[in-house]
Design a protein with these regions (language model features):
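Extended amphipathic alpha-helical segments with heptad-repeat/coiled-coil character used for oligomerization
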Residues: 287-330
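N-terminal mature-domain region immediately after signal-peptide cleavage
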Residues: 19-260, 267-272, 279-302, 335-471
C-alpha cells in the first residue's frame, strides 16, 4: 500500500460489513457493523486470530488509514515511507513481545487475505507513528547533531477529566475524554473495539483501524479499570532500549486489574514515547489516579474523593523542568493553559453534580478563558483550530490548522460495570467540519485534499460489549 490507493478502495471504506463472514475458522465469532459514524468490531481468540479478524474485517479502513498516516508523516518529516518502515524494523519490532507481535502479524495476514498490499512493517509503523514521528525522530536527529523539522514536536491535544466521591452526583467515578488531532487523522479515529483475548481482561475501547492500542486511549476492561489520557506537550527524550508505548498501553488496558498494576505496566520499560498524563479509575474501589508519565519523572497522585482535570498541561515541577523544558506555565494565551483554567472552572461550577450528561457538556464547551468569551477555537475544551487565526507555537500548529476535537467519549461506574460507554463521532459540540469550503479558503492545506473529508458530527451513541447493530 502506498499513496496510489484507488478510488474504489476509498468507496469500499464507506460500506457496511455484513455480519455473516466467510468460512475461514480464524474469523469465528468476529463481526463488524457501522453505527452513528462509528465502526464497531468484535474480536475474539488467540493473538493471531484477533489480529487476522481485525485485518480482514477492516482491510479497506486500514488501507485508508495507512494512506493518511503515511501522507502526514512523510510530509512533516520530509522523509519517505521506507524511512518509517526501517525504524519499525530496527527500533520498534525488536522490542515487541511475542503476544503482540503475533497480533500485529495477524493484522498483516488479514489485510493481505482481503487483497491489500500491506505487510507487518506497515502495520508496526502505523501503530508506532505517534511515538516515532514526534518523539523518536527528534531525539535521533539531536543525537546526530541535526535540526529536527519544526512540525515534529510533542503536541498537546486532548481534553479530559475523571472524578469520584463528593465530586460526582452519585459518588462514583465519571470519566470523559475528547480526542484532538488533525482532522484527516481524527475522522478515521472512530472505531469501537470489543476484544475478548485468550488471556487477560475483556476490553472495550475506541481506536483507529490497524492499531492494537486505543491511541487516544479511552476504554474500560472487565476488571473495572477505566482509562484515558492527554499528551504532555513539548516533551523531549527517548530511551532506545525501552518498550514501545503502544505495547505498554495495550498491555495495561488488557492486563491491569487495579491502579497499581496499571502504573507498573506503563512505567516498566518506559521508552518516553507518546508521553501522557494518564487518568485512571478503579470501579471496584472508587479510587482515581493521575499518572504523569514522563521519562525522567513519573509522579502519581491518587484520590478517593475529588477529581483530576487534564488538557495537556504538565503539573509536577520536576517533570516540567526535565521532561517538558519548553513548557511555559505562565503563558495563559496557550491552548493548554487556557483549557486548564476553563476545565477547573467547569468542574468547580458543577462540583458534586458531575455525571455523564455534564461530562458531555464539558467536552462540548466553547468558553475561551483567555478572551473571556464563548468562541469555538483552539482555546476551547472542544477544539476548533481550523477557525483560529493565531498559531499555537507550542507544537508549531499554523493558523487555521484543520485540527481539533474529533470525538468525545464519556462513561460512569455503572456503565463500566456493564462495559459500556457513550461516544460522539466528530466535534463533541455537534458542529460539522466541511472540507471543500475550508480548502477553498485555505489552499495552503491542499496537500491534504485527497484524504481530508467532511467530518460531520453524529449523535451521542452508547456502545456495549458483544453488541450487535440491532441494539
Amino acid at each position: 500500500m502506498r499513496l496510489c490507493l484507488t478510488a474504489c478502495i476509498l468507496a469500499a471504506f464507506a460500506s457496511t460489513a455484513a455480519l455473516a463472514q466467510p468460512s475461514d475458522p480464524r474469523l469465528k465469532n468476529s463481526y463488524t457493523f457501522q453505527k452513528d459514524g462509528w465502526t464497531y468490531i468484535h474480536l475474539e481468540g488467540t493473538p493471531s486470530e484477533i489480529g487476522f479478524q481485525h485485518g480482514y474485517l477492516l482491510a479497506t479502513q486500514i488501507a485508508d488509514n495507512l494512506q493518511t498516516i503515511e501522507l502526514e508523516n512523510t510530509h512533516e518529516a520530509g522523509k519517505p515511507w521506507p524511512y518509517f518502515r526501517a525504524i519499525a524494523h530496527n527500533q520498534i519490532m525488536p522490542r515487541i513481545e511475542p503476544e503482540y507481535r503475533a497480533e500485529l502479524q495477524g493484522i498483516a495476514d488479514g489485510v493481505q487475505a482481503a487483497g491489500q498490499n500491506i505487510d507487518i512493517l506497515d502495520i508496526v509503523a502505523l501503530n508506532a507513528h505517534l511515538e516515532v514521528s514526534d518523539y523518536y525522530i527528534p531525539w535521533l536527529l539531536k543525537q546526530q547533531g541535526k535540526t529536527s523539522p519544526a512540525a515534529l514536536v510533542a503536541p498537546g491535544r486532548c481534553s479530559a477529566f475523571i472524578a469520584t466521591g463528593a465530586a460526582t452526583k452519585d459518588g462514583k467515578i465519571v470519566i470523559a475524554h475528547s480526542n484532538w488531532s488533525a482532522y484527516m487523522e481524527g475522522e478515521r479515529w472512530t472505531t469501537v473495539f470489543d476484544i475478548v483475548p485468550a488471556k487477560g481482561n475483556h476490553i472495550l475501547m475506541d481506536g483507529s483501524p490497524g492499531l492494537i492500542h486505543s491511541g487516544d486511549d479511552f476504554g474500560v476492561n472487565s476488571a473495572g479499570i477505566m482509562i484515558t489520557e492527554t499528551t504532555l506537550p513539548m516533551f523531549q527524550g527517548w530511551n532506545p532500549s525501552g518498550i514501545p508505548e503502544f505495547i505498554r498501553a495495550r498491555k495495561a488496558m488488557q492486563y491491569a486489574n487495579n491502579i497499581d498494576q496499571f502504573v507498573a505496566l506503563m512505567r516498566e520499560g518506559n521508552n518516553g514515547g507518546y508521553a501522557n498524563s494518564w487518568l485512571v479509575g478503579d470501579r471496584k474501589t472508587n479510587e482515581i489516579a493521575y499518572l504523569e508519565l514522563g521519562l525522567k519523572h513519573t509522579p502519581l497522585s491518587r484520590k478517593t474523593t475529588g477529581y483530576f482535570v487534564s488538557a495537556n498541561f504538565p503539573v509536577n515541577p520536576d517533570l516540567i523542568r526535565d521532561d517538558t523544558p519548553g513548557f511555559d506555565t505562565h503563558d495563559m494565551k496557550s491552548t493548554m493553559n487556557a483549557r486548564h483554567v476553563r476545565a477547573e472552572e467547569f468542574v468547580q461550577q458543577h462540583l458534586g453534580q458531575l455525571d455523564t450528561a455534564l461530562a458531555e457538556q464539558y467536552l462540548s464547551d466553547h468558553y475561551d478563558s483567555y478572551d473571556h468569551k464563548v468562541v469555538a477555537a483552539r482555546r476551547s475544551l472542544c477544539g476548533h483550530e481550523d477557525v483560529s487565526k493565531d498559531p499555537e507555537p507550542a507544537w508549531d500548529s499554523p493558523p487555521f490548522s484543520p485540527s481539533g476535537a474529533v470525538t468525545g467519549k464519556v462513561m460512569d461506574a455503572s456503565m463500566a460495570e456493564h462495559m459500556s460507554f457513550t461516544a460522539r463521532a466528530g466535534h463533541p459540540c455537534g458542529e460539522d467540519f466541511l472540507a471543500a469550503p475550508f480548502l477553498a479558503a485555505h489552499p495552503e492545506f491542499n496537500w491534504q485534499a485527497h484524504v481530508l473529508h467532511d467530518m460531520k458530527a453524529g449523535p451521542w451513541s452508547t456502545f456495549t460489549i458483544s453488541q450487535h447493530k440491532t441494539l
